[in-house]
């Protein structure tokens, strides 16, 4: 997933960095914090369950650029398109809409797992802990 987001960003000629946001588990606020820390003013937030948001620093936290909430249905090409769109926003270009799948049975099928992941993620939230830049290596 991260490799595809990186590829989408790099295809647009931009750089990236990873930052862990500790203060909240709300993906909109995570993405907004990422955007505020970003040199371009655009950030991507990803929850452990896969829900992903593209945000811009001058927007209100709950007024994001794009929200991808069908996490179990987001495939690798979609994550690549998310990276590409975030880079296009950063370059002040108009991105193409990211095609999303819709499956009415995905929510009931994955809701319990998603809730458990979110509960676990929320347990690690620490309002007083500052964001931390991460170095991620792929092997």
Task: List each model region and its residues.
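Short coil/turn connectors at secondary-structure junctions
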Residues: 14, 38-41, 133-134
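Ser/Thr/Gly-rich flexible loops in soluble cytosolic domains mediating phosphotransfer, phosphorylation
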Residues: 61-101
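N-terminal glycine-rich FAD/FM-binding segment characteristic of electron-transfer flavoproteins
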Residues: 19, 30, 137-139
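Internal, active-site/partner-interface "lid" segment
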Residues: 93-138
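Glycine-rich phosphate/diphosphate-binding loop of Rossmann-like nucleotide-binding domains
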Residues: 1-13, 17
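Glycine-rich phosphate-binding loop
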Residues: 25-60
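Short beta->alpha junction loops
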Residues: 19-25
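Conserved active-site and cofactor/substrate-binding residues in soluble primary-metabolism enzymes
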Residues: 4, 25-29, 39, 74-85, ...
